[in-house]
Each structure stands twice: as C-alpha cells, then as structure tokens.
Curated annotation (Swiss-Prot):
Entry annotated with the keyword Magnesium: no
Gene behind the chain: dnaK
Protein name, as recorded: Chaperone protein DnaK
Gene3D superfamilies for this protein: 1.20.1270.10, 3.30.30.30, 3.30.420.40, Actin, Chain A, domain 4, Substrate Binding Domain Of DNAk, Chain A, domain 1
Modified residues (Phosphothreonine): 175
Family per record: Belongs to the heat shock protein 70 family.
Bias (Gly residues): 594-605
Name of one Pfam family that matches: HSP70
Region (Disordered): 587-623
Protein species of origin: Mycobacterium avium (strain 104)
Listed Acidic residues bias regions: 609-623
Function of the protein: Acts as a chaperone.
Alphabetical list of HAMAP family matching this protein: DnaK
A molecular function (GO) term: unfolded protein binding
Keyword annotations from UniProtKB, A to Z: ATP-binding, Chaperone, Nucleotide-binding, Phosphoprotein, Stress response
Length: 623
C-alpha cells in the first residue's frame, strides 16, 4: 500500500511529515532543514528553484521570485514569467512537488497520497484551490484538514481518555486562526473556529520594513520603496530582526551599500530597533487577534476558565507580545511548551493520513465549517442553510418556492459568510433550475440541499418536487480553474519534473566528465615528469591528450550526448594507457629479477601460471 504524507502548506514555510511505525516523523528536506520556505523562483537560465535556494537568490532576482502565494489562493491572481502566466495553484504546486520529492527520497518509495492542511477560516474557494495545487503536484489529496484541528490531533492524541477542552491559537506567516476543540476517548471535535485570512507574520515584517524606510528617508532623503532590490534586502533584514527580538531586547539592522546618493556615493543603513518600539509599531496587528478569540468563546458557549490547555501554532507565536496576549486572554493560563509550533500541524496531518489509511486506529476527527452557507432569497437576503461551526461532513435541505406567478425557472446563488445581505458575502457560485411548470407564486416547491464533504467542499442541489427535475453544482468557481486547466497544469508540472530530472542528469554527466578530464590530465603530466621519463611511448600519451582535448571541447558546449561520447573515448584511452604502464612495469620487473626473479614470480612467470585468489585480512584471520 502506497504511503501517505501530511503536509502543512504554509504562507512562509512548509513542512512534510510521515508515519514511521505508527509515529509521526518530520522529514528533513534535501538541504537538511525540517522546514522549507514557501518560495518559488524562476532563474534566468530556465531553472525553477524552490525553498531555500529560491530564498537565497531573491535579492538579485526580485521580479522572478514569488513568496507568500498562499494569500492569493482562491483568487484570480496570476503572475507572468517569460510570457507564461502562473496561477497561485501552480506556484503552490511547485512547493508541494519539492516536499513530495524530499519525502520520497527519505522513504525510498513513491508517494501518491497526502493530507494537506489549510487555515480553519479558509473559504470554499481557497480550499478548492489548495486541493487543485495538490493535484497539479501529482498528489491524490485524501483530505483537506484545518490547521488548528491537525495541531490538536498531534497534541491531544496521547492525553488519555479524560475529555479536555483545548484552545489552539494559530498565528502563521499569513493567516490567523483560533479554534476550540474537545478531545477525549480518541475523538477530536472542533467546537468553534474563527480567524483572519489576512493577518500573519508577514504583516509584522512589513511594519519593520516601513519603519526602516521612514528612518532612512529621514536621514538621507531617499525613498527606498522605489528600489526593488533594496526592498528585498529590507524584507530579509526585517524577518531576521523580528526573530532576534523574540529573544533579545534590541537588535541592530545593518545593511551596507543599500543604495547610492545623487553623486553615486554608497549609502549605508544602520538602525537599532528595540523590542518596545517593535511592539509599539505592531500593537494594532496584535489587537486584531482579540475579536476572533472572543467570538470562539461565545460560539462554543463556554467560559475562559473551562479551557484546559492552550496550544500555540505557527512561528509568529514565538513573539513575546503574542504569548503575553494569549496569557492575558486565557486568564493567565500558560501556553503548552511541549509542541513545536512550526511542526505540529504537519505532524497532525500525518496522523490524519494514518487514520484515513487505517494505520492509526480509534481516532475520529470531527471538523467544522468556518463560515455559514446559504442562498440569496427575495429582497437580496442571505438565507442560511448551514450555520458556521457546524460539524462536517453534513447535509441540510430546505424547501423554497417561486417569487412570481408562472415563474419557469429559479436562479440559485450560493453564498458563504455571516452578513445578512447576500451581496455582502462571498458568492461561491450560481446555477439555474429550469422547466418549472406554470403555477401561481408560492405553489412550486423547490428543495435546496447543501452537502459539505469532509474536505469542507460544497455541493448544492436544487430539485423541483413536482416534476422531479434537479440540477447540481459542485462549487469550484472560486478557484477559477476548469478540469481542463487543472489537467494542463498537471501535464506542465510533469513536463517540468522531466526537465528537472534531465537537468540533474546533465549536471551529473558534466561533473563526471570534468573529474575524469582532471584526473587523466594529472596522470599524463605525472608520466611525462616521472624520473627517468615516461614508461610508455609518446604515441600512447598523445592519444590520451587528443581524447582530453575532445572532452574539453564537448564540455564547452551543451550537447550532453557529445560529452558522454567524449567521456567514453577518454575512458578507453585512459584504460589503454593504464594497460601500457602495467605491461611496461611487468617487463621491467622481469628484466631486473633475472633467473631469481622468475622464481620469485612463481615459477616460469608465464601468464598461464597466474592464480585467482582472495585477499585475506591477516588480523581478522588470526582472531
């Protein structure tokens, strides 16, 4: 049975985990790190870089480096590189493909199935887009799981049978969620969830960048926002400063040669940022986490004192101000320190993958839909069929009627959100039910059914009870990708995977050829410079020289077949040289030994007397 992995596809960093003997293990990437930056870059030589290599070259390749694409999931965002448009799904798929490759290298087998996590407050379009990214990456997405739910699963699975209430405070690179869950007897049930899809560590970084821009403008009069390369350096410095301020009271931000003045003199940026100043310029961001917390407590119908454990998720929760706020909101409760906020979501996803594959027994995960779902009815009102925080999967039906006499069809407009007026919510999709027989208004009965699957993806059906006619829609307009487009992107991704494989193979061939040229060249040089001259004729050495020259010429080009051919020829000439040296050495030994030499060589010294034997380790034999 194929293995399944758990993937935390994050805004700034992503993690992959797998079950080994029933226990979740976080897989280190090819660079040796347990987290992979969610960054994709298109190098000018055509290579696509993902993760740390992409991050390393971001300063010198600003326009072709894409980060924080998770914030664009479920929208019509795209970026054009070399005349080709890439959607958010395609960029995310690149990150997923790297995680898949790294996990396959670790396990030594192919991976086809995955559980991918999303912020609890992701709407239908964002979930659908995440699933599509997985498909483009060549993964069968078994389940889309909410990040706080995965974290609670990882945290609470070994906490015994006593029922406990857990608050998960998840502040990542680009999104914020707070969820209340109940765990007991192998059941993980989400009671309520709330959040903000546009609040995360990136916003804290941006505040430091803006602060640095203002400081520099005040001292030099130059606006760095007009210099893309300088802004990229500021972003990297801001992220580093934010991390340092989690453990220090102040940090130095020193960027030499950040720009030049009107006279082309280099200018330096050197600022000291204190933790107090950092907290002052980001206080409003922190305050934005308060309301979702209050909403969750109210929706779950509990008091703060009922919370047994607080789990912090996401690297941004390492900021002292965030930890202090959580303690304040929970009445002084100390957040749990036993989980790694960067890895716990992927660990939970791997456990859920194990549940779905039957590797983990007696665990039931009951998730919820984060936002209400309904349709637009007369007067533009949002009529909710499924309230937010309803446990999924779920199915609800309600009967509606026509608004006008002899109305031949009804337009079903599906919305997601909490506003009373439908237009103020997110339109997920619409479809029409036609063929309703003529009848006075209020007579036809149209049954509308909402069905949410375990991934949180919505299916809506409208049925005329009188005629039995029905129409169904699977909500996917939000992502804007048709099946044909997804198939095309999958093929593109596969083609690029083949390109990447070829590129790696070419690099290996080139490296082998260069190494062979170097070693052979050195060997020939040593022969010519040997005391007493070379043991082999110059003619033999010249043939090797010619093969070396051919190999160098091939290496100067791009034809890999030519390099392989030249390498093969050089290998043959090298072997011939080695054989000639061996024969010359044997001949010398025979001449030097005379009659005694023949005896020492084992009798007559003829080739027929050579004996096949094994070399024995004397030390081992004597033991």
């Amino acid at each position: 049975m194929a293995r399944a992995v758990g993937i935390d596809l994050g805004t700034t960093n992503s993690v992959v985990a797998v079950l080994e003997g029933g226990d979740p293990v976080v897989v280190a990437n090819s660079e040796g790190s347990r987290t992979t930056p969610s960054i994709v870059a298109f190098a000018r030589n055509g290579e696509v870089l993902v993760g740390q290599p992409a991050k390393n070259q971001a300063v010198t390749n600003v326009d072709r480096t894409i980060r924080s694409v998770k914030r664009h999931m479920g929208t019509d965002w795209s970026i054009e590189i070399d005349g080709k448009k890439y959607t958010a799904q395609e960029i995310s798929a690149r990150v997923l493909m790297k995680l898949k490759r790294d996990a396959e290298a670790y396990l030594g087998e192919d991976i086809t199935d995955a559980v991918i996590t999303v912020p609890a407050y992701f709407n239908d379009a964002q979930r659908q887009a995440t699933k599509e990214a997985g498909q483009i990456a060549g993964l069968n997405v078994l389940r889309i799981v909410n990040e706080p739910t995965a974290a609670a699963l990882a945290y609470g699975l070994d906490k015994g049978e006593k029922e406990q209430t857990i608050l998960v405070f998840d502040l990542g690179g680009g999104t914020f969620d707070v969820s209340l869950l109940e765990i007991g007897e192998g059941v993980v049930e989400v009671r309520a969830t709330s959040g903000d899809n546009h609040l995360g560590g990136d916003d804290w970084d941006d505040r430091i960048v803006n602060w640095l821009v203002d400081k520099f403008k005040g001292t030099s009069g130059i606006d760095l926002t007009k210099d893309k390369m300088a802004m990229q350096r500021l972003r990297e410095a801001a992220e580093k400063a934010k991390i340092e301020l989690s453990s220090s009271q102040s940090t130095s931000i020193n960027l030499p040669y950040i720009t030049v003045d009107a006279d082309k003199n280099p200018l330096f940026l050197d600022e000291q940022l204190t933790r107090a100043e950092f907290q002052r310029i980001t206080q409003d961001l922190l305050d934005r986490t308060r309301q979702p917390f209050k909403s969750v407590i109210a929706d779950a119908g509990i008091s703060v004192s009922d919370i047994d454990h607080v789990v912090l998720v996401g690297g941004s929760t390492r900021m002292p101000a965030v930890t202090d706020l959580v303690k304040e909101l929970t009445g002084g409760k100390e957040p749990n320190k036993g989980v790694n906020p960067d890895e716990v979501v992927a660990v939970g996803a791997a456990l859920q993958a194990g549940v779905l594959k039957g590797e983990v027994k007696d665990v039931l995960l009951l998730d919820v839909t984060p936002l209400s779902l309904g349709i637009e009815t007369k007067g533009g009102v949002m009529t909710k069929l499924i309230e937010r925080n309803t446990t999924i999967p779920t199915k609800r039906s309600e009967t509606f009627t026509t608004a006008d006499d002899n109305q031949p069809s009804v337009q079903i407009q599906v919305y997601q959100g909490e506003r009373e007026i439908a237009a103020h919510n997110k339109l997920l999709g619409s479809f029409e039910l036609t063929g309703i027989p003529p009848a006075p208004r209020g007579v036809p009965q149209i049954e509308v059914t909402f069905d949410i699957d375990a991934n949180g993806i919505v299916h809506v059906t409208a049925k005329d009870k009188g005629t039995g006619k029905e129409n169904t829609i699977k909500i996917q307009e939000g992502s804007g990708l048709s099946k044909e487009e997804i198939d095309r992107m999958i093929k593109d991704a596969e083609a690029h995977a083949e390109e990447d494989r070829k590129r790696r193979e070419e690099a290996d061939v080139r490296n082998q050829a260069e190494s062979l040229v170097y070693q052979t060249e050195k060997f020939v040089k040593d022969q010519r410079e040997a005391e007493g001259g070379s043991k082999v004729p110059e003619e033999t050495l010249s043939k090797v020289d010619a093969a070396i020259a051919d190999a160098k010429t091939a290496l100067g080009g791009t034809d890999i077949t030519a390099i392989k051919s030249a390498m093969e020829k050089l290998g043959q000439e090298s072997q011939a040289l080695g054989q000639a040296i061996y024969e010359a050495t044997q001949a010398e030994s025979a001449q030097a030994g005379g009659p005694d030499g023949a005896a020492a060589g084992g009798g007559s010294g003829s080739a027929d007397d050579v004996v096949d034997a094994e070399v024995v380790d004397d030390d081992r034999e004597s033991k």
